[in-house]
Design a protein with these regions (language model features):
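N-terminal secretory signal peptides that target proteins for export/translocation
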Residues: 1-6
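Bacterial N-terminal signal peptides
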Residues: 9-21
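A short, N-terminal "cap"/entry segment at the start of jelly-roll beta-barrel domains
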Residues: 22-102, 194-204
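His/acidic/aromatic-lined binding-pocket segments of jelly-roll/cupin-type domains
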Residues: 101, 107-111, 151-152, 159-160
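Short, conserved beta-strand element in jelly-roll/cupin
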Residues: 104-119, 123, 132-142
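Double-stranded beta-helix
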Residues: 128-154
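Conserved metal-binding segment of the jelly-roll/cupin
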Residues: 153-173
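A short hydrophobic beta-strand segment most commonly corresponding to one strand
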Residues: 175-193
């Protein structure tokens, strides 16, 4: 009888001790941010102004470029490969892309700053072809036909998220359209690039 009571008492103390330990881990007394071993927390922020984006867009128009990265930086966290960058893309009125693009590694977030147009998104590409590594998009493939792709219209103020591996192409620009693209590169495939070092060297 006494042995049974002491056994339950010991188990109870053990459970209370484990619970207290977990509670201490979940709610530490130290209010500073959690610093995990092997993670980077010393990277600087990169402000990009509206004036810089506008100047970049105008340089692209003058050089007849349609997609030029502004920068690509280390994103920190648990992998030194993880990167994030910003590009500007311009589409002239009536411009269409003959091919779908699919990025192996890089996800994209579009923010439309001017104009309106239609895109084809998703589906299954039947005529895959590998393409050269892009400065902004890294590795990827292209194709002309995507079964099941859907039409999406994007306009000024809209945001569009395109995960890596999702086919997409510009179907028709109803007017001159410009959008900022945030590109997330988890494997560090695209080259790093400092803000202000963009090259405008003819149509992409």
């Amino acid at each position: 009888m006494h042995r049974t009571i002491w056994r339950y008492f010991a188990v109870g103390l053990f459970v209370v001790g484990v619970a207290a330990s977990l509670a201490g881990q979940q709610a530490p007394n130290d209010p500073s941010p959690l610093m995990l071993p092997g993670h980077r927390y010393d990277l600087p922020a990169t402000p990009i102004t509206a004036a810089q984006i506008e100047a970049h867009k105008k340089n692209m128009i003058a050089a007849k470029n349609d997609d030029v990265p502004m920068n690509m930086v280390k994103a920190g966290g648990g992998s030194d490969k993880h990167q994030v960058g910003v590009s500007v893309v311009n589409r002239n009125k009536g411009q269409k892309n003959p091919n779908y693009a699919v990025h192996d590694d890089v996800a994209e977030v579009y923010y439309v700053v001017e104009g309106k147009g239609r895109m084809k998104l998703g589906g299954k590409i039947s005529d895959w072809k590998r393409r050269p590594v892009s400065a902004g998009n890294g590795r990827g493939s292209a194709g002309t036909t995507a079964v099941g792709a859907r039409d999406v219209t994007i306009a000024k103020g809209d945001v569009l998220i395109i995960p890596a591996g999702t086919p997409h192409k510009w179907e028709d620009a109803e007017q001159f359209t410009s959008y900022v693209v945030v590109r997330v590169d988890p494997d560090g495939v695209a080259p790093l690039m400092e803000l202000g070092t963009a090259k405008f060297t003819g149509a992409n």
